[in-house]
Amino acid sequence: LHALIRDFGLPVGVLDRLIAALRWDIHREPHADAQGLAAYLEDTGAGLMWLAARALGAPDGAENAVRAYGWATATAGYLRAVPELRAKGRHPLPAGLSAQDLAQQGLAKLAQARSARRSVPRGVRPALLAGWQTKIFLDQVL
């Protein structure tokens, strides 16, 4: 990991926030509110996709598009996990936030990413492949 960070100049702060956010996965407390869940999605899915894109040479100008796509992709994955999390006694959605609301937010981020897709060089696009079914799943939630 050290060599990857060094060789590709990956932003360590993004990795630190990713690790800190993943602690939620091992605890039973729900996200405090919708902003807490949004921060979790930003620090995990958006951050991880940005790290992958940087490792493939993404310029700074691609960050917003890549992060928005990562957020949407993380949202789709999170919503897919909601039934299992509930079955395990977890409370994955904060009070006042429905799965449909979260899916709408994910679709908005996806639209944001798509409108800025020209900022993402062709050689960086493999970092985005994890999200190829994002829209399909988010639409199903609605």
Which role fits each region the language model picked out?
Residues 1-4, 8-23, 37, 41-50, ...:
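Catalytic cores of Mg2+-dependent Asp-rich isoprenoid enzymes
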Residues 24-36:
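Acidic/His metal-coordination segments adjacent to aromatic residues that form catalytic metal sites
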Residues 53:
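Hydrophobic pocket-lining residues within nucleotide cofactor-binding pockets
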